[in-house]
């Protein structure tokens, strides 16, 4: 496992059986490039596992937050399921399997003695927990298992 940014890893010629992108897609200024870079690290029979937050399909391809999303300043696009699948198709990635969409829980991201700052709970509208404090739909997570079409 190499838990570091691909562009800084110095392993450009290495091919892997499996690559993971866990909670990174929505932080990318160019998510297609991120996925293409991951694909480039796969063996021809390799697999890619993507975990990301998704927006409701009513947003079309993606929700593009102004300034912040759920208190996070570095969220550029929150794709819908349709938007993710369209990107996968454009990049010639076969969708092998997918999870259901599951709302993010305050139990996953909470204050602890090691992280005593604001938590996920503080990023939600206190009067309506289905919305972020910015008024966007609260995050839901989804996993995708992909294989390259070479």
Predicted region positions:
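Hydrophobic/aromatic anchor residues within beta-strands of the central parallel beta-sheet
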Residues: 1-3, 48
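A short acidic, Gly/Pro-enriched loop at the edge of an enzyme's catalytic core
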Residues: 7-19
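A short SAM/SAH-binding and catalytic strip from SAM-dependent methyltransferases
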Residues: 16-31
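A short glycine-rich, Lys/Arg-flanked "PGG" loop and its adjoining helix->strand segment in the class I
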Residues: 32-47
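Short, glycine-/aromatic-enriched active-site segment of Class I SAM-dependent methyltransferases
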Residues: 53-75
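Short alpha-helix
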Residues: 75-98
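Conserved catalytic loop of SAM-dependent methyltransferase domains
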Residues: 94-123
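C-terminal lobe and adjacent flexible extensions of AdoMet/dcAdoMet transferase-like proteins
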Residues: 128-150
């Amino acid at each position: 496992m190499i838990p570091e940014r691909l562009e800084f890893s110095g392993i450009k010629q290495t091919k892997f059986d499996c690559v993971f992108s866990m909670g990174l897609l929505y932080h990318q200024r160019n998510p297609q490039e991120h996925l293409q870079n991951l694909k480039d690290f796969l063996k021809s029979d390799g697999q890619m596992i993507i975990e990301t937050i998704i927006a409701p399909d009513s947003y079309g391809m993606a929700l593009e937050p102004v300034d912040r999303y759920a208190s996070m300043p570095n969220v550029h696009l929150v794709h819908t399921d349709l938007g993710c699948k369209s990107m996968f198709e454009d990049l010639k990635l076969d969708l092998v399997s997918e999870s259901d969409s599951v709302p993010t829980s305050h139990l996953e991201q909470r204050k602890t003695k090691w992280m005593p700052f604001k938590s996920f709970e503080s990023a939600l509208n206190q009067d309506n927990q289905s919305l972020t404090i910015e008024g966007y739909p609260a995050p839901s997570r989804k996993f995708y298992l992909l294989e390259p079409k070479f």
